[in-house]
Amino acid sequence: MRKVIICSPRGFCAGVIRAVQTVERALEKWGAPIYVKHEIVHNRHVVDKLRAKGAIFIEDLQEVPCNSRVIYSAHGVPPSVREEAKERGLITIDATCGLVTKIHSAVKMYARRGYLIILIGKRKHVEVIGICGEAPDKITVVENIAEVEALTFSTKDLLFYVTQTTLSMDDSADMIAALKARYPQIITLPSSSICYATQNRQSALRNILPKVEFVYVIGDPKSSNSNQLKAVAARRGVVARLVNNPEEITDEILQYSGNIGVTAGASTPEDVVQACLTKLQKLIPTLVVETDLFVEEDTIFQLPKELQ
C-alpha cells in the first residue's frame, strides 16, 4: 500500500514561534502599525497574515517614522542598524533568534581577542549580513570549498569559524573538514553553529529517505533551511520538490509509484502542510498517511521582556 510519510519534527521551530508571536503580541498591545525590519521569517504565508493585521515590513529604517516601534526579524541585524534606530528615537523590540544572537556574541568576543573569523554561509543572506556587521574588518565569508581553498591565512594566525544557522549539515561538514585540514589551529564554538531545529529537520528527512521515492519540501523559495532540506534529499538521489502551497503540487506525482515523503521548513505553518497533504490525498485517494517521529522538540524561547 502506497504511503505518504510525514517527517516529525517539521515546520515552525522555537525561534520562529517566538518571532511570529512577538509581532502578534506587539500588534495586540500597541495596535497597528508595527514596523518590522525585514520579513519576520522567510515565509510568504506568515508575512501576508501579519501584514493583514497591521505589520509593515521594511528594509530601510528611514521608512519608519520617528518614535515608532520597530521589531528586528528572527535573522538579526548588524550593530549599525541598532545605532541608527537609537539615533532616530525608534522604540525597538528584538525578535532575533537566540541561536543567532549566540553567534553574534561569539564573533564579537573572538574579534576582540584578536582572532580572524571565517563565516560559512551565504554572503547575501540577511543573517550573514547581520553577523558580519559585528566585526566587518575581521570576517571572511566562504560559501563553498573552492572559497575555502582560496583563503590566504597563515597557519600561525588566530582563526575562529562559525556557520550560518540554517545551512545543510552535509555541505557545512565538508567545508569545516577543508578548513581544519588547511588550518589545524582553527577553533569554533563548543556546539555546532547550525541550529538544533535545522539539524533535527535534516536528520528526520534523512531517516525516511530510504523508504521513499519522492519528497515534497513545503516551504518558501526564500527560506534557506527549506532549500537545504531539498538539497539533503537530492544529494541522496531522491527526487525532491520545494512547494509553498497546495497549488504547486501537480499530477507530476502520478508518474511515480513509490512512497512519498513530506517535510517542511522551520518557517512553514502547519496549516499549509495540512493543505498540501489534502491535495496529495485528492490526487491519490488510496494514500496511507504515516508520521515518522525522529525526535521530540521541547525548546521554548521566551518573548522579549517588553511583551511578557
From Swiss-Prot:
Pfam family, one: LYTB
EC supergroup of this enzyme: oxidoreductase
Binding site for isopentenyl diphosphate: H42, H75, H125, S223, S224, N225, S267
Matching InterPro entries: LytB/IspH (IPR003451)
A GO molecular function held by the record: metal ion binding
E.C. numbers: 1.17.7.4
Keyword Iron-sulfur: yes
Needed co-factor(s): [4Fe-4S] cluster
Catalysed reaction equations from the record: isopentenyl diphosphate + 2 oxidized [2Fe-2S]-[ferredoxin] + H2O = (2E)-4-hydroxy-3-methylbut-2-enyl diphosphate + 2 reduced [2Fe-2S]-[ferredoxin] + 2 H(+); dimethylallyl diphosphate + 2 oxidized [2Fe-2S]-[ferredoxin] + H2O = (2E)-4-hydroxy-3-methylbut-2-enyl diphosphate + 2 reduced [2Fe-2S]-[ferredoxin] + 2 H(+)
Alphabetized UniProt keyword annotations: 4Fe-4S, Iron, Iron-sulfur, Isoprene biosynthesis, Metal-binding, Oxidoreductase
Amino-acid positions noted as binding (2E)-4-hydroxy-3-methylbut-2-enyl diphosphate in the UniProt annotation, renumbered to this chain: H42, H75, H125, T165, S223, S224, N225, S267
UniProt-listed GO biological process terms: dimethylallyl diphosphate biosynthetic process; isopentenyl diphosphate biosynthetic process, methylerythritol 4-phosphate pathway; terpenoid biosynthetic process
Active site (record annotation): E127 (proton donor)
Residues holding dimethylallyl diphosphate: H42, H75, H125, S223, S224, N225, S267
Pathway terms, separated by semicolons: Isoprenoid biosynthesis; dimethylallyl diphosphate biosynthesis; dimethylallyl diphosphate from (2E)-4-hydroxy-3-methylbutenyl diphosphate: step 1/1; Isoprenoid biosynthesis; isopentenyl diphosphate biosynthesis via DXP pathway; isopentenyl diphosphate from 1-deoxy-D-xylulose 5-phosphate: step 6/6
Cofactor note: Binds 1 [4Fe-4S] cluster per subunit.
Residues annotated for [4Fe-4S] cluster binding in this entry: C13, C97, C195
Function: Catalyzes the conversion of 1-hydroxy-2-methyl-2-(E)-butenyl 4-diphosphate (HMBPP) into a mixture of isopentenyl diphosphate (IPP) and dimethylallyl diphosphate (DMAPP). Acts in the terminal step of the DOXP/MEP pathway for isoprenoid precursor biosynthesis.
Recorded family membership: Belongs to the IspH family.
Record-linked PANTHER family: 4-HYDROXY-3-METHYLBUT-2-ENYL DIPHOSPHATE REDUCTASE
Designated name of the protein: 4-hydroxy-3-methylbut-2-enyl diphosphate reductase
Taxonomic source organism: Chlamydia muridarum (strain MoPn / Nigg)
